Amino acid sequence: MGGATEDDVAQISFGYGTFTGALGLHGGLEKIGASVIPMSSGNTNKQIMFLTDMGVTLLVATPSYALHLGEEIRKRGIDPSKDLKVHIGLFGGEGMTEPMRDEMHKVWGDQFVCTQNYGMSELCGPGVAGECTELCGMHVNEDWFIPEIIDAKTEEVLPPGEKGE
């Protein structure tokens, strides 16, 4: 899961309501033996307190909230890339563009591994597709889904191995 291991302390900053991202990632992280802090969403001051005081190594959030947290941490005179242990970001709930990923590295450090996942609360929450640490695009969970990849211009179905949408 994005490079997470049993040695990680994960802070989940997704809501634990009807959005299934929090519970899905919570369960997956516990399954690999990571410690999980179920922060839920909001309360930026408390989020920052836990990030700094609990030795958090992995942040689960939307990419925009991770950037917001980084900005707020910097306002306190703390450099997230040097003063915190966070080295992995598992992001979902919204898309992460390459410029956002570049900004993540500026805020959280060059060694910060940030991957994104895709899910739908109506089906299974997180787990439809996700990036690995190679960051070459998302992998569809083929145990559950059969993807149909099409050419964006012609809308024709592409053969296996071809890139499309």
Q: Residues of each region from the PLM?
A:
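Short hydrophobic alpha-helical segments of the AMP-binding
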Residues: 10, 29
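Conserved coil-to-alpha-helix start sites within the AMP-binding
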Residues: 14-26
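Conserved adenylate-forming
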Residues: 1-9
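Active-site glycine/GP-rich loop and adjacent strand/helix microenvironment
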Residues: 32-165
